[in-house]
């Protein structure tokens, strides 16, 4: 018998906390806009044109590819092409992940000529496994955005059109965004140009594009996949994620990437990895065989009531209900849970991530490397360089973060956001009955039968926005920020999250996704559940 509380929750769209969510997002936007106005910054139309790309002359109807490196001699190390778990697998890499001797621009004019002299650890592992790396993909500038429209190369178009099998609609009123910030990586996977792609996920930048494009996207547990060679946006939140058409493919790639890395000080220790592996093995071994008619019997899945704010469009609900029904048919017990700090998570995320970005991006001064404006004298060159080379969204977040760290604002903004983050982490720990292998504090772990193993929620509040709506002049950032409202809590908690396609919306035909979340280090649990769910849904 289905849990009535869960079904009441997903039938009734809206909650008493939704207004709070909206106010939080608006406050971030208003604060940043006010700072921009006071500083009278102007964007450079030449540096941030929506028509300019450099794609080595290759026609790319989705504007997803920055560079084609298929013929590169550095595609894979000697011998890797003939062996390895990923032999013959084609891949694309987001342009904020370093690839030796190839442009790593972060889709920014600031790094338009930057070519690293080393591979990111994730890229090195892919090469060693025999991967054929073909493309560098477009993204929101420095990973900041939810629509992949904040790019020096222009917006990425969504290949998942239900009305055209041959390419983009070429109509801004109908054409949709691919999601951000890893929209280019999602687009090349959806278009069938590569088997999988790497993206980065700070607050939803892999999961949101996966949902909008109708593919699978994994944000790993923080620290499981090395960040060495990933251009920093927000160090305490950044992760390297995987996008592919199937959970099975994501699982294989993740197993290659999930390695301890001495280059990365935030890389999870071998001890924590071993403890997590033991937990995963215990949980999965307690489930029936995959050949069973109910392979998830005994699994408890929680649906948080706070994940249905008024911003959630009703067309998202039918595919979500099908996912709930699918899990129940697979034997899982689905129950309603509460994550009470969710309404405050969005504003906390934007304050914390912007504060970290303001520090990380201070290094781009036009002196040591990066874009430089020679016309301005002395210290004015610093301001002129950053004003010209950074896009509007990046400048806005730098200013918001800088303000939040000032002596006058620190207590009211950054400190409060950090407290909210701790509350979000406690909420997840209380809801999940699996021990957190990254901490020795068992007080934050639910040990009784009321806890759940996995959490399920809609991936996004709606299907992909149209390009016309997303790029409308004067469109407030709050509308874009709210797209992250369902993805940022798992990021603040450092937990793994897997976006799985759940089918198409009945009215507009565009993809809808659902997301599975579990305890830190339980990525394999999500992948195990996700494989069965994707098969059950036929997506």
UniProtKB/Swiss-Prot annotation:
GO terms for cellular component: glutamyl-tRNA(Gln) amidotransferase complex; mitochondrion. This is Glutamyl-tRNA(Gln) amidotransferase subunit A, mitochondrial. Keywords: ATP-binding, Ligase, Mitochondrion, Nucleotide-binding, Protein biosynthesis. It is found in: Mitochondrion. Its EC number is 6.3.5.7. It comes from Mycosarcoma maydis. Subunit of the heterotrimeric GatCAB amidotransferase (AdT) complex, composed of A, B and C subunits. The active site is at 94 (charge relay system), 181 (charge relay system), 205 (acyl-ester intermediate). The lineage of its organism: Eukaryota, Fungi, Dikarya, Basidiomycota, Ustilaginomycotina.
């Amino acid at each position: 018998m289905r849990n009535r509380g869960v079904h009441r929750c997903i039938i009734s769209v809206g909650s008493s906390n939704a207004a709070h969510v909206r106010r939080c997002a608006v406050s971030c936007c208003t604060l940043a806009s006010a700072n921009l106005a006071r500083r009278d910054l102007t964007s450079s139309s030449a540096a941030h044109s929506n028509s300019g790309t450099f794609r080595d002359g290759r026609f790319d109807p989705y504007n997803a590819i920055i560079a084609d490196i298929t013929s590169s001699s550095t595609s894979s190390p000697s011998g890797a092409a003939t062996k390895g778990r990923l032999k013959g697998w084609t891949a694309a890499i987001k342009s904020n992940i370093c690839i030796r001797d190839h442009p790593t621009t972060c889709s920014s004019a600031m790094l338009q000529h930057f070519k690293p002299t080393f591979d990111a650890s994730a890229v090195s592992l892919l090469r060693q496994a025999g991967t054929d790396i073909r493309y560098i993909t477009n993204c929101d500038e420095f990973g900041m955005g939810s629509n992949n429209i904040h790019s020096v190369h222009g917006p990425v178009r969504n290949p998942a059109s239900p009305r055209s099998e041959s390419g983009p609609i070429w109509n801004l009123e109908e054409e949709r965004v691919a999601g951000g910030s890893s929209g280019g990586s999602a687009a090349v996977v959806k278009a069938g140009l590569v088997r999988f792609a790497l993206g980065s996920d700070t607050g939803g930048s892999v999961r949101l594009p996966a949902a909008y494009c109708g593919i699978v996207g994994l944000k790993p547990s923080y620290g499981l996949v090395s960040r060495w060679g990933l251009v920093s946006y927000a160090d305490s939140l950044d992760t390297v994620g995987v996008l592919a058409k199937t959970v099975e493919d994501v699982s294989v790639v993740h197993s290659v990437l999930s390695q301890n890395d001495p280059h990365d000080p935030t890389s999870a220790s071998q001890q924590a990895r071993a403890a997590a592996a033991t937990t995963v093995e215990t949980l999965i071994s307690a489930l029936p065989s995959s050949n069973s008619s109910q392979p998830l019997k005994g699994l408890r899945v929680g649906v948080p009531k706070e994940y249905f704010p008024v911003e959630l469009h009703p067309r998202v609900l039918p595919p979500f209900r099908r996912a709930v029904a699918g899990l129940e048919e697979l034997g899982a017990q689905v129950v309603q849970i509460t994550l009470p700090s969710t309404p405050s998570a969005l504003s906390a995320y934007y304050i914390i991530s912007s504060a970290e970005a303001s520090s990380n991006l201070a290094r781009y001064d036009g002196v040591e490397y990066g874009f430089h404006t020679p016309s301005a004298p002395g210290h004015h060159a610093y301001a002129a360089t950053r004003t010209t080379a950074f896009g509007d969204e990046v400048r806005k977040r730098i200013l918001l973060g800088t303000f939040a760290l000032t002596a006058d604002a620190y207590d009211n903004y950054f400190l409060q956001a950090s407290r909210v983050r701790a509350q979000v982490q406690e909420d997840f720990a209380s809801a999940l009955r699996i021990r957190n292998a990254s901490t020795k504090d068992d007080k934050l772990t639910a040990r009784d039968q009321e806890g759940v193993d996995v959490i399920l929620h809609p991936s996004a509040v709606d299907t992909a926005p149209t390009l016309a709506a997303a790029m409308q002049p004067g469109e407030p950032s709050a509308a874009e920020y709210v797209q992250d409202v369902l993805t940022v809590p798992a990021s603040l908690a450092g937990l793994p999250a897997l976006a799985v396609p759940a089918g198409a919306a009945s009215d507009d035909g565009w993809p809808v996704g659902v997301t599975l979340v579990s305890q830190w280090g339980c990525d394999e649990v999500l992948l195990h559940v996700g494989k069965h769910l994707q098969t059950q849904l036929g997506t």
